[in-house]
Amino acid sequence: MPIYNAPLADMKFILNDVFHAEQFFQANENLAHVDAATAEAILEEMAKFAQNVTLPINRSGDEEGATFSNGQVTTPAGFKEAFKQYADGGWIGLGAEEEWGGQGMPKMLTVLADEMLFATNPSFLLYPLLSVGAGMALNSYASQEQKETYLPKIYSGEWSGTMCLTEPHAGTDLGIIKTKAERNQDGTYNITGTKIFITGGDHDLAENIIHLVLAKTPDAPAGSRGISLFIVPKFLVNADGSVGERNAAAPGSIEHKMGIKASATCVMNFDGAKGYLVGKENEGLAAMFVMMNYERLSMGLQGLGASEFAYQNAAQYATDRIQGRSVSGVKSPNKVADSILVHGDVRRMLLNARANNEASRAFAVYVGQQLDITKFSTDAEVVKAANNRVSLLTPVAKAYLTDTAFNAVIDAQMVFGGHGYIREWGMEQCVRDLRISQIYEGTNGVQSQDLIGRKTIKCNGVFMNEYITEIRDFANDLDADLNFIKDATLDAATEIESVTQFILEAAAENSEFSNAAAVDYLHAVGLLSFSYMFARMAKAAKAKEGEFYQNKLSLALYFVQRILPELSLRITKVKAGSEVVMNFSEDYFTNQS
């Protein structure tokens, strides 16, 4: 059976030493109820749940999968019990407002809790994760009556939530959705249409499912300006809050997928289902993007969790597997061979994974802290700066973390050799489960276009320049004995500053340029961000003594010498322009003659 030990020491180091969590909590009156001891206790309890409850049903859940029969989805054995335990423990509402039954914990803490569940059972976590996202959208845009009706039961786990956007013909371009919302005299709407790829669209974990559905009224403006958001419960809710009659919202089937097989991905049919408008007509996309942005950071955590899981198992296998001898001489004379951990290429794969894991974890906490500032700070200027940072870095958190994680998981599978390709060791499931993280909630290519387009060109590089200024201010303050990471980070910041200006000028002259450059630009920004995280971790580690902290400095040096140089390659590709990409005719791609 695969192993997993929650990286609690690293999590506590990042929270307490790198981001000074307790000081941050105490400086925000809305977080004064949280201290370091509380945060650490939460992480320790989640580690137990992940290791003892969700990990044991990960492989069996994959093998059994969610099933569909007679219009009803059934989750694999053990999922109902695990979900009840998760809900009873208050985990669904960990970061939710206390007003609605949540615990009011900061995002910089909840990202670490989510990482552990993504590491041990991503299919399981997707069910409550969609509920949390739906709750966030409702809390931001729903009426007081709607909040009182739905939020307490969503956060208690009695009910769950979904996000219904995609249609067979409308994925990234939501402006062309066909789902209709016909007004009724009583203020409700009849929702008619089909949605696809709906995670948790049906299941047996909760007594009701609250679908958040994008639809258009008959007189709606064309395109995305005409999208409205509706609450469409699986079962209608009575005046006293109890579950009533069945609504005309039902799954038509579930998808047969490459991975996350225990997570029900449904085709949802709405046949005149009763719906309730959230906010105002034609303003639904803004509400849905509250949920989407939350999910995008969560997908980054899915990548991190899988990569950590894969790394731990590959490192253990490399330690145990004896094969060949070290090129520098026998290391284990009492054995017939040395462990494969003595080989440089095996170490390269493991160190790449570990470096990216630790930087990803720090980056997730950093973005989480920025989200906390936007939610809890009372300083308007500080909130504005944090909002800019979140806007800029959300696509990086989603795309770069999942891209690096997938590479790490493939490398971990390679460490196992042929054993990585068979079911026994868990690596092939890890690969299959993780692949979707680069695809859903906006493909990584779309995230890259968002970064270079909306978050860079549209604001004339202001968001990026603010971020670079923050990085430079931090790096310039580092002591001389950290010059290796200081200089590397400052050089990376200068390279990103320069290529950003290049992009602004090139995009003004050539409309095709930004699309062709987007993925390489995002990866370059991701590398700068990881260098910034290693600079912050190195500063914290330098102030401490012990092997744990010395290893932090050694890993930072590895990152500088073996991973960060890719930044220059990415920038070279950005500057190559779009002509070599766009010069091929459309016929070229299908004409094999």
Role assignments for model-derived ranges:
Residues 31-33, 63-75, 287-298, 312-353, ...:
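Glycine-rich cofactor-pocket loops
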Residues 188, 192-246:
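A short core secondary-structure module
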Residues 100, 112, 458, 473-593:
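C-terminal amphipathic alpha-helical interaction region
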Residues 2-5, 19, 90, 183, ...:
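Alpha-helix capping/hinge segments and adjacent helical runs
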Residues 132-134, 143-146, 150, 443, ...:
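A structural-propensity feature for long, helix-poor, extended segments
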Residues 1-125, 145, 149, 372, ...:
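Amphipathic, small/basic residue-rich leader segments at the start of a protein or domain
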Residues 197-199, 236-252, 257, 264-295, ...:
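A glycine-rich, basic-preceded beta-loop-alpha segment at the flavin cofactor/substrate interface
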Residues 79, 130-131, 142-183, 368-387, ...:
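Internal maturation/activation junctions in enzymes
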